Amino acid sequence: MTRQDIIDELESRGFDDTIFLDDPSFEDAIIGITEDGHLIYNYDSMVNNLVDNYTKEGLNEDEAYTSAIEWISYNTIRAIPYMKSYGKEPIIAYSFNT
């Protein structure tokens, strides 16, 4: 689904205050939506998408993986609690093996 497809689906369900994560590489990590309109992102997919971007930029696999985890932890996960005042903050789903 494209971002616009997701927006259209959200609007059809009456959710106009759902917050998307800004990084476009995270759009492929959207795995669903809660009953009350929170987008659900898969953490492993978020990491893998950033690793792909970083390796294309020249980092080796280990550096890219470490950088991706650090970036998501610092710039995304830390920010989620502050998003609540702007709308329905995203939820990050973790695999059991993470």
Regions found by a protein language model. Give the residues of each.
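C-terminal alpha-helical interaction appendages
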Residues: 1-98
